[in-house]
Amino acid sequence: YFLGYTLITTSAVFWLSHVNMRSAAWLSSFVFIAALLTGATQSAAALIYVGLFFAGVGAGMLYGISITIIGQSDAPDKHFGIALAAQLVLGSALLFAGPAIIGPQFGFAGILIACAFFVAILSVTTQWTPTSISAENQQGGDKTSTGHGATVFVSLIALLCWFTGYSGVYAFVERIGVAGGLTGQQIGLILSLTIITGVAGAMGAAWLGDRWGAMKPHWLGMAGTLVTIGLLSNEPSLLQYSLAIIALTLTLNFWLAYMLGSVTRVDISGRYAVLTTAALGGGAMVGPAMSGFVLQQTDMLQVLLISLILIFAGFSGITMALRRFSAMPVTSH
């Protein structure tokens, strides 16, 4: 799934700006639905994998189009926060119904069919997708292109490092709870609340918007991350683990809105914003694999340390990109 997701969004930088976005969104919805149904109706493992690959293609393209549209809005940080909150709220329905209701009765195929039905319902909103996006919406003039490519590249690498680090932590939060002596029921109850705290973090970003400027939210996110890693260290107790998960989901969803907003802020062409989806997909693949490898060689503390280093690298990279962008000369129309 993530392979198809990452490949399509990486290639989109070459062609997305040249196609009708509404038509591309309709096509992506169709591919997404057809791929999910293919995976649900096939018994051969190879065909199921092919279905999931193309499901990733459809989902990645839809997400890339959404990122591009939001990135060119007048308040991307705010709108990314709203979008992330909507993802969590809508996704929570399937996240609950899949393993609790649909899976036990209809199996994996039933879950895929339910996902296809869900995508079909949401695809109705595609009719409001703009056909194209103009990147020339800067107020007071446009930044010159000098150094633009390097700044965007730095911001994308920063996002990749950042999400790799966070994915590496998130993939093993259950094991951290078990190491602290918590029961599966306790861990499940705590993790079930992450939808609420995640939405709160995303809506916090939507409410704050750009009131604190471009830099301060990143410092706040880094502070929240340090608190999270500190709480997850040393086999946390029930209270400590609960606070850590609250801090993790609040910080992740709050900060993600600003990470995405910052990349689109420095991408004055509007062409490269779609690569944020590739960076997120890459991080989602590499992070858990990296943490699993490190855990086999050492212990969970080293996993947390390496993840923290990657998150800090992302923080350093995105703030450097923002400083470079703010220092670029402006040309008036």
Placement of each model-derived feature along the sequence:
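Helix-to-loop junctions at the C-terminal end of transmembrane segments
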Residues: 7-21, 201-214, 295-296
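Structural signature of the two symmetry-related core transmembrane helices
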Residues: 23-37, 216-231, 308
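Hydrophobic core of transmembrane alpha-helices in multi-pass small-molecule transporters
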Residues: 47-61, 160, 240-254
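Intracellular juxtamembrane helix-capping segments at the cytosolic ends
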Residues: 60-74, 253-267
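C-terminal membrane-cytosol helix-exit motif in multi-pass small-molecule transporters
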Residues: 95-106, 110-138, 317-322
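Extracytoplasmic gate region of multi-pass secondary transporters
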Residues: 150-192, 196-200
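C-terminal transmembrane helical hairpin of 12-TM major facilitator-type secondary transporters
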Residues: 209-259
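A late C-terminal transmembrane helix in Major Facilitator Superfamily
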Residues: 266-300, 307
